[in-house]
C-alpha cells in the first residue's frame, strides 16, 4: 500500500516542510500563476528524458505534450476545476465526489479515524461501517483535508534573502525567509501556507490551502476486503481490493457544498483510454546525483533493510514467548513487510545496470552543458564533486551514525530523552537543540511522564539484536561497544539493562525529569548510565552529519538551479507531497510469461479466495460470502494504468478527459517501485479500484443506496 511508505520519513522529501495554518479570513484568488518556462513542454525541451516521469505541477502543465500524445489539451477552467476538487489528507490524497461534501479516499488512509470512532464493543476496521443517514456519520478526531487554492512563484524573494557564505548560514537564512513568507501569507489570507522547494531549490513556490477540519466517516468496508491478499498480494497485480473509504466535510455543523467536485463515471475507463491521476506524491529521487543514488544503493538501503529484518526477528522471538503478542504486533509486522518490499524495490532500481547507465548518461550530458558555458561552469561546475565528497564522508561513519543512538528500544529511547531533557533544559532556550526549544521541551517532558505499557521480552530481544548488529559492524575498541557491552555478550547486556532498569515506571521517570540534571547525573539506573555515555557520542555524529548534509543541500540546490536554467519546466520536479497531475493510459502488461489484463472482476476475487481455500489472508468477510449472489460478478473491480505515482498518491482520483472519476488509486505493482529514481512505463503500473466496482459493492454488499445515489447524482 503506497501511502504507508510516504509516512516513513527515512526518505528525503524535497519540499520545505514547515506549514503555517491561519484562522483569519480575507478573499484570495483561486488562480495559479504560471511557473517560469511554463510554456516549455517535453516536445521542445533540450534533451527531454522520459525517465523523469509525469508528475506535473499545476502551474506548468505540458499542454503541447498532452495534445500530441492524447489529442487532448485541457483549458484553464478544466485544470482549475480538477485542482479544486482534489484535497490532501495528512498522509494521503483524496477528492470531493459530491455536491454535499463527500470525500473519497483509501481504506488505509482513513484507518486512524475508523479506529477512533469505533464503539467499544465493535471494531469498524474489521466489521466495516455504512452510515444510514447524516446523523449516523461519525466525526473523525483531528482529521482534516487541505484544498489547494493558489500557487505563486517566490523564487526571487527566497534567493535574495540567502546571502551567507557557508552552507550553515545559507540553511539558516533559507529557513528564516521561508518562515517569514509563510507567516505573512497566513496573516494576510487566513489560509494554510507552505513554501515548496522544487527542482531541489531551483524554484520556490508558495502553495496556499483552505483547510477543512470537520470530517466525518460515512462508509468504510472491512479491512479484509480492502486489503484482500494481505502482504503476499501487496505491490502485485492482478488485485481484488476494495481499498476505499468515504468521508464527508462539514462546515458549521452542516455538510459542505463544494463548488468543485468530481462527477462519477458509471462505466469507468476502458482499455487504452487516457486517464489523469491527481494527487500528492510524497517523495522521489529522480533529480538526485549519481553519487547520492550510489550511497543509497550501497549504504543507506542495505542498512535500512537489515534494520527491518532485525525488527521482524525481534517480533517473532517475542511471539514465541507470548502467543498474544501476534495480535499486538500485527499492524507493525504488516508495516515492516510493506516497507521491506518497497525499499527492496527502490534498491533493485539502483542495482539495475541499465537504469544506472541512463542516469550516468544524463548526468554526463547535463554536466557537459554546464561546463560548455563559462558562467554556468563558474557557478555550478563543482557542485557534483562537492556532493560526491560529502556522500563519501557520510559513508565512512555511517555505522557510528546508526548505532550511536537510543533506538529501537522504547526503554532506552526514554532514557535517552530523559538525559537529553536534563541537559537541554539547563540551557537558555536559544542555545538548546532545535527539537527541545519552546513548547517542544514541555511536550517531551509530558510524554516521558505518561504511563505506557512496556513489553519486557520485546525490549530484551530488541536491545540484544541492536547490540549484536553493532558488535558485527563496529570494532571492539569502539567507545559505544565498550560502554554498551562492557565485556558482556549482547544477550547478557540486554538482560542486565532491562532487568535492572526502572525506566518502565512513569513515577521514576517523572522524578528524574523534575530532579533535572542533578538527579540524572546521580542516577545509577543502568539505562540512564548507558544513555549518559551515548549522549555525547550521538551529539558528535549528528553534528558531523548535519554539517555534511548542509553541504549536500547547498550544492544540490545549485544543481537544481542549473537544471532549471537549462530545462525549465520541461522536466517535472521530484515529488514533494504537493498536488500533481500525471497522465497515462489504461493498459495491461506482460508478466510471468503471460499477460496481465487491464482489469479484474468480482469473478476473479472469488476464484482467488477459493484457490487458497478461503484461508487468511485470502479469506472474505462474511457478507461477501453470504451475499455473493447479489453481485454482477462481471463488474470490473480493479484496473491498471501507466500513470506515475508513489507513496502519498494513495486515495488519488483517476479521471477521464471529461473530469469524471473512473477510479481510485491505492497501490502500484512490484515493477513500479524502482520508478522512484527513474521512471519507465513498460511494465510498471498504477493500481486503482474501478468506479463501477465501488458502486456495485456499496449497493449490493453494504445496502448503501443512499450513498451510491449521492455519488451518482441521483
Please give the residue ranges for each predicted region.
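Terminal presequence/propeptide segments associated with secretion/organelle targeting
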Residues: 2-5, 9-10, 14, 18-714
